[in-house]
Amino acid sequence: MKNKRKGRLPISTAVVVLVILCAGILLIESQTKIIRRWIDDVIYDNQNHYLACEQLPSISEVEKVLEEHRDMVDQIEAINPGFVGVEVHPCGNGNADITFWYDSHQDRIMIEQIIGNDTFFGVPYNLHNR
């Protein structure tokens, strides 16, 4: 007597479905960085812009923006002196972004409230908990 297994997928079909599902997840992640953003935010308490170096402004433009808005930079650094800071972060081809670093999640929240935007006056920035 044959042992019929109705309603069960053959192993090869299950493997194909799994491979397609994984490929779809990888494609979505490569375009949106949704998993990486979640890990950065929830686990590391960081926020990154994920732009390529070629998409960033020149180092001189970044330094000019920081100088023009020195009052806001001072306000950010005053959140927790010695434990909050601002750096120009060059990426190697003459372009740069800004990194705001901080000691606690509360510091990060205050930095985000002061900046109030996805860029610092047009310059992409990262938030790093150190």
In which residue ranges do the predicted regions lie?
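Short glycine/threonine-rich beta-strand-turn micro-motifs
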Residues: 45-53, 80-107
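N-terminal presequence-like segments and adjacent domain-start helices
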Residues: 26-67
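Short proline/glycine- and acidic-rich turn/helix-capping motifs at secondary-structure junctions
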Residues: 56-61, 123-130
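N-terminal Lys/Arg-rich, disordered targeting/topogenic segments
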Residues: 1-7
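Short amphipathic alpha-helices in soluble, non-transmembrane regions
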Residues: 108-118
